A protein has these predicted regions:
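Residues within helix-turn-helix
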Residues: 24, 35, 53
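Short, charged recognition helix plus adjacent turn
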Residues: 57, 65-74
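A detector for short, charged/polar N-terminal pre-domain segments
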Residues: 1-7
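Long, hydrophobic alpha-helical segments
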Residues: 48-52
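Conserved hydrophobic/aromatic packing and binding residues within compact polymer-binding modules
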Residues: 12, 26, 37-40, 66
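Short basic helix-loop element that most often maps to the first helix and adjoining turn
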Residues: 10-29
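Recognition helix of helix-turn-helix/homeodomain-like DNA-binding domains
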Residues: 31-45
Length: 74
């Protein structure tokens, strides 16, 4: 089984890129540090539930969308 942190990070990258956003733009819009988001996207950082909700709101998707495997429609 692939590490859930890696899958989450891949899904986050996918959703961010669909908007044409850089990590910097996502960081600015969500209020999270770019370095933290980079670690999450690489599967190196754990993410708190509160931050999943912040990212979902920022990306305009339900929080559950961030937990789906990469390659899923949103």
């Amino acid at each position: 089984m692939t590490d859930p942190k890696i899958l989450f990070g891949q899904r986050l990258v996918e959703l961010r890129k669909r908007l044409g956003w850089s990590q910097e733009k996502l960081a600015l819009e969500s209020g999270l540090a770019r370095s933290y988001l980079g670690g999450v996207e690489r599967g190196q950082r754990n993410i708190a539930v509160v931050n999943i909700y912040k990212l979902a709101e920022t990306l305009n998707v339900p929080p559950s969308t961030l937990l789906e495997p990469p390659g899923q429609p949103d």
